[in-house]
């Protein structure tokens, strides 16, 4: 047993050597199970403090690491840093700014713009609350400058965190090679590792010119953050959460906004109550929702863009119309995986028909030693999901936690619409499909939040609880209204823990709040 303290100390950082000494006496009292000794030695040896990287490889040499991460977005960075904490020699390949979509052209700058839009909405309520009306003109350039500066600070923080973790940043595009063991090439140099993670994310989808002539005249959500001024006239195409968020922001800030959707409701994959209510709230807020409509052609004119569309209401003849003088045409029709230039075929890495990398529940691809997390996998395209999956993977690979994997069930999500949406678990239709209609019961409510008790402007708050089986286990919660974005997290914990309707009923309400409705549903 005396060998075990030495094994714990060998190659470990100072903190782990101190821990080994502290437990020496305790360990000497233990029996001598060889399997336990080997497992502890291996685990402690890997959990050493991050060490500085060695010198760069000589020209023509192949640099070797314990862990190579392709993609410096949220999932890749989280996985690399956790691996480094566990003692792995890691490197991240990135060709653009650190932080990926979320930090640079997604969640973070979008939330800044959403906050700006919410501020604009509340300004309309000032007089109702006894303050003089605020007639100040919105200055797009001011918030753009502050937003971009904030993003730049986050980029620097990511850079600093990698440096502190002794993780090397390899700048450039990575592509797999045909070498005998998994190898990538970046700017003419080769790098290899027994474990390679693909975390390249996704990018906005746009129609091809052959499908819609002039489609390239529009922008995507990426381009939204490059706009130098507020568009006077905006047309958003799409019915998903990005389309809903962009339309809400632009409209609230003063752009005349149309949202073009192929069916009659937005967010059709959400619970039907949310889909219906969100569509109504958009219209109530002044967004023109063009239902059963699609863009046919886009032309550039002296006064902006001319968007031709066809509206095909079921049971009626299609009608062609044109929207003139459009300043901003924004495509929000989905996202595609960023795998085009990775040369996945050289290793035979399998993808689905949309290009998403196919992985199992442990994030393994079909090629040993190659893994994928995040949007590139096409499942639950959310930053916290990529981060959690990446960290779980690092623990499995470098801490020998063989069962470490992300549970993709009951993942909460928020749509920053106006008002915001919060949802976790199964929709009513999904619950019926899983448990049978006779085993599903729903509880719902609709009310005006107290904030609007004295305002001319009104928004609703709607809530639905989906319960299953005799014990009425809560399998889904869906809500839209003021504050729903912030109140969901706690209720998501309850759903994840398997709470029942009775558990909610036995919780004393907080009054007066909107959240109390979920513990008083009847």
Swiss-Prot record:
Keywords (A to Z) from UniProt: Acetylation, Cytoplasm, Disease variant, Disulfide bond, FAD, Flavoprotein, Hereditary hemolytic anemia, Mitochondrion, NADP, Oxidoreductase, Redox-active center, Transit peptide
EC number(s) reported in the record: 1.8.1.7
List of residues binding glutathione: 74, 81, 158, 391
Amino acids binding FAD: 74-75, 94, 101-102, 110, 174, 375, 383, 511
Residues that bind NADP(+): 239, 242, 245, 262, 268, 334, 381, 414
Matching Gene3D superfamilies: 3.30.390.30, FAD/NAD(P)-binding domain
Other comments on record: The active site is a redox-active disulfide bond.
Pathology noted in the entry: Anemia, congenital, non-spherocytic hemolytic, 10: An autosomal recessive disease characterized by hemolytic anemia and impaired activity of glutathione reductase. Patients experience hemolytic anemia in response to oxidative stress or ingestion of fava beans.
Protein name per its UniProtKB record: Glutathione reductase, mitochondrial
Gene (name only): GSR
């Amino acid at each position: 047993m005396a060998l075990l303290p030495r094994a714990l100390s060998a190659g470990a950082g100072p903190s782990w050597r101190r821990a080994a000494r502290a437990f020496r006496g305790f360990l000497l009292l233990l029996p001598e199970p060889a399997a336990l000794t080997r497992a502890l030695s291996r685990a402690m040896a890997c959990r050493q403090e991050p060490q500085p990287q060695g010198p760069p490889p000589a020209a023509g040499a192949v640099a070797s690491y314990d862990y190579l991460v392709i993609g410096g977005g949220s999932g890749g960075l989280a996985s690399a840093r956790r691996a480094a904490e566990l003692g792995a020699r890691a490197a991240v390949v990135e060709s653009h700014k650190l932080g990926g979509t979320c930090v640079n052209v997604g969640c973070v700058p979008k939330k800044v713009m959403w906050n700006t839009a919410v501020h604009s909405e509340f300004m309309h309520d000032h007089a109702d609350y006894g303050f003089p009306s605020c007639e100040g003109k919105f200055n797009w350039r001011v918030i753009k400058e502050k937003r971009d500066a904030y993003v730049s600070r986050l980029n620097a923080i990511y850079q600093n965190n990698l440096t502190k973790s002794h993780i090397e940043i390899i700048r450039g595009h990575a592509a797999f090679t045909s070498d005998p063991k998994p190898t990538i090439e970046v700017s003419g140099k080769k790098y290899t590792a027994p474990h390679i993670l693909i975390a390249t994310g996704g990018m906005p989808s746009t129609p091809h010119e052959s499908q819609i002539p002039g489609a390239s005249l529009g922008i995507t959500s990426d381009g939204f953050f490059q706009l130098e001024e507020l568009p006077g006239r905006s047309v958003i195409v799409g019915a998903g959460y990005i389309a809903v968020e962009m339309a809400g922001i632009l409209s609230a800030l003063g752009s005349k906004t149309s949202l073009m959707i192929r069916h009659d409701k937005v967010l059709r994959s959400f619970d039907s109550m949310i889909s219906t209510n969100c569509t109504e709230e958009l219209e109530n807020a002044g967004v023109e929702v063009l239902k059963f409509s699609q863009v046919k052609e886009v032309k550039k004119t002296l006064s902006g863009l001319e968007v031709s569309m066809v509206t095909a209401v079921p049971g009626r003849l299609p009608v062609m119309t044109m929207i003139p003088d459009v300043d901003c045409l924004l495509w929000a029709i989905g996202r595609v995986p960023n795998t085009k230039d990775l040369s996945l075929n050289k290793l035979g890495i399998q993808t689905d028909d949309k290009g998403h990398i196919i992985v199992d529940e442990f994030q393994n691809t079909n090629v040993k030693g190659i893994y994928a997390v995040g949007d590139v996998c096409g499942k639950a395209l959310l930053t916290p999901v990529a981060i959690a999956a990446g960290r779980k993977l690092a623990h499995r690979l470098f801490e020998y936690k063989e069962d470490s994997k992300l549970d993709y069930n009951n993942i909460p999500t928020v749509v920053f619409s106006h008002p915001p949406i919060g949802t976790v678990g199964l929709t009513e239709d999904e619950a019926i499909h899983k448990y049978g209609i006779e085993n599903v019961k729903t509880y719902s409510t609709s009310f005006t939040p107290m904030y609007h008790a004295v305002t001319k402007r009104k928004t609703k708050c709607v809530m639905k609880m989906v319960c299953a089986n005799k014990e009425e286990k809560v399998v889904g919660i869906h809500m839209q209204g003021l504050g729903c974005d912030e109140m969901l997290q706690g209720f998501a914990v309850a759903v994840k823990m398997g709470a029942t309707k009775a558990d909610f009923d036995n919780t004393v309400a907080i009054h007066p709040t909107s959240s109390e409705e979920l513990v008083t549903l009847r």
